[in-house]
């Protein structure tokens, strides 16, 4: 048996499966897809015997690197600006990983393919491993970084923060709604095949440039598993394509999955890479250049376009619009400014941009200074307490944004905002596609066909609404973003740990916080129309040349 080929071993495993012919199995995870005509193959023939030794070696490398980082005093060299953003990133990323593990039973239940079930089971183990080594990385940062505050509350903070809940929405997309939509198209075909390129390849490169070689070790270990996950997703995609009835659903899901991944992943990873780095070499790639290489060329041209030969309509318009938003509409820079605006309710510190940063941004994104430079200068000016409020509550020509109901990223490209009354509530969307996702895609019927398994976008999706009318100091206290002395805030708009320069609860007490979405629903029709027009026309202090 020890010399048996993998092919024969894989065949033996599939023989252990069985399909009852005397009864219809109970459906645990529903799907509107049909697989009656589907081919049933697993091209990689994944089995545990070859899998576990390989993963053990990768784990040994990860934990060896962690030990080496401590012995080599990595934390004396790593940039504080970079590690502060890891408080947010490493609070979010284990959740999508463990959600992906939860998604695998959904796919196994929904896909009648004994060959691929073993590969999906292996993927489930992968995702648990990924989450585990990421949590261990976060713990190591917490134990060795100069300012552990924020790392120590990430599990709680991730769930109650205005940015963390965007990541939660992203991860919950793997396990909610139609089983194939969630566990295959959204997770595997788009998130893992496309956006792990910037997440697990481009971002580790930036980490290394900032003195952090632990994150590259961990995330390259993660990325090395993705080829198998991509194979699983592609196999199920081909099964679905075998039945013409699935084509409208596939085209719907590709549009939704692509756009939601772009809205969330590009917002987060783009910000971490562009605004978390101190490496401003002129030959260093911008996020836009990384995106062009890793997403547009590597995924769109190499993976998506060939699907057209199967008669599938690819969302070319959304790919081009995502690129347009990153390059021409400054999507990532708008997100970074929003995160910095909200610094009092963060659990990480955000470093101010310097002249070196300004010069680099202007080199990579011509016109950046005219749009964002003045605001960042004001951020520097208002960084310390005593004579001013936090920047969100000062007059710096910046209007706090509405929240997108679908992707939950604020409506930052203001001219693209869509407003509509849906399910008895006035909702704002960052784009036409996010509005379509809520109003058309996630509904019990699609193009005249019943789609009962899609579900709805529900819940408390507007973070600001949960805290409407509260005092800012009370919000921060309720969130738990206060240091051990009971008064100093964990978040700061600078990296100076001098107690005299750090904001406390007393510095923010008496500042009322309001929700734009609550205000929108309280307006009359005329007031609402005027407000929306003014919001969409607001350039937020941009200098017109």
Curated annotation (Swiss-Prot):
Highest taxon of the lineage: Bacteria
Cofactor remark: Binds 2 Fe(2+) ions per subunit.
Record CDD domains: AAMH_A
Residue runs in coiled coils: none
Keywords assigned by UniProt, alphabetized: Iron, Metal-binding, Monooxygenase, NAD, Oxidoreductase
Family the entry assigns: Belongs to the TmoA/XamoA family.
Role this protein plays: Component of the propane 2-monooxygenase multicomponent enzyme system which is involved in the degradation of propane via the O2-dependent hydroxylation of propane. Under acetone induction, also able to catalyze the oxidation of phenol to yield hydroquinone.
Name of the protein described by the UniProt record: Propane 2-monooxygenase, hydroxylase component large subunit
Organism: Gordonia sp. (strain TY-5)
Record gene name: prmA
């Amino acid at each position: 048996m020890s010399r048996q080929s993998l092919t024969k071993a894989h065949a033996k495993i599939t023989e252990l499966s069985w399909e009852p012919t005397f009864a219809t199995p109970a459906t645990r995870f529903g799907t509107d897809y049909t697989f009656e005509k589907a081919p049933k193959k697993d091209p990689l023939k994944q089995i545990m015997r070859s899998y576990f030794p390989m993963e053990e070696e990768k784990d040994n490398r990860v934990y060896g690197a962690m030990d080496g980082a401590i012995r080599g005093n990595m934390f004396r060299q790593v940039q504080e600006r970079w590690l502060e953003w890891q408080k947010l990133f490493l609070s979010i990323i284990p959740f999508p990983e463990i959600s992906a593990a939860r998604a695998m039973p959904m796919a196994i239940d929904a896909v009648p393919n004994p060959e691929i079930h073993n590969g999906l089971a292996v993927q489930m183990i992968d995702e648990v491993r990924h989450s585990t080594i990421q949590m261990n990385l976060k713990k190591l940062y917490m134990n060795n970084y100069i300012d552990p505050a924020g790392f120590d509350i990430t599990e709680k903070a991730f769930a109650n923060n205005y940015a963390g809940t965007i990541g939660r929405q992203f991860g919950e997309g793997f396990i909610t709604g139609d089983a194939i939509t969630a566990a295959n198209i959204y997770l595997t075909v788009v998130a893992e095949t496309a956006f792990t390129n910037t997440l697990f390849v481009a971002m580790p490169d930036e980490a290394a440039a900032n003195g952090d070689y632990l994150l590259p070790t961990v995330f390259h270990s993660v990325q090395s598993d993705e080829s198998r996950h991509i194979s699983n997703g592609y196999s199920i995609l081909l099964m679905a394509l075998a039945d013409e009835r699935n084509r409208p659903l596939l085209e719907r899901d590709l549009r939704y999955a692509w756009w939601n991944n772009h809205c969330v992943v590009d917002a987060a990873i783009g910000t971490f890479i562009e605004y978390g780095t101190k490496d401003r070499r002129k030959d260093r790639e911008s996020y836009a250049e990384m995106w062009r290489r890793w997403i547009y060329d590597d995924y769109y041209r190499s993976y998506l376009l060939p699907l057209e030969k199967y008669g599938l309509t690819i969302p070319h318009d959304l790919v081009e619009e995502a690129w347009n938003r990153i390059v021409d509409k400054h999507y990532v820079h708008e997100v970074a400014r929003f995160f910095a605006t909200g610094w009092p309710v963060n659990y990480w510190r955000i470093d101010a941009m310097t002249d070196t940063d300004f010069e680099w941004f202007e080199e990579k994104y011509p016109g950046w200074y005219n749009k964002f430079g003045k605001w960042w200068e004001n951020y520097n000016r208002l960084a310390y307490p005593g004579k001013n409020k936090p920047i969100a509550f000062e007059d710096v020509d910046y209007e706090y944004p509405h929240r997108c109901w679908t992707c939950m990223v604020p409506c930052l490209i203001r001219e693209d905002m869509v407003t509509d009354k849906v399910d008895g509530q006035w909702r704002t969307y960052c784009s036409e596609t996010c509005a379509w996702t809520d109003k058309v895609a996630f509904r019990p019927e699609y193009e005249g066909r019943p789609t009962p398994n899609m579900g709805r976008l529900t819940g408390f999706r507007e973070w600001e609404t949960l805290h409407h009318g509260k005092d800012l100091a009370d919000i921060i206290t309720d969130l738990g973003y206060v240091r051990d002395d009971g008064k100093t805030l964990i978040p700061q708009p600078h990296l100076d740990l001098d107690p005299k320069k750090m904001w406390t609860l007393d510095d923010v007490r008496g500042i009322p916080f309001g929700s734009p979405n609550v205000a929108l629903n309280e307006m009359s029709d005329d007031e609402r129309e005027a407000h929306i027009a003014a919001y969409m026309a607001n350039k937020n202090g941009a200098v017109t040349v």
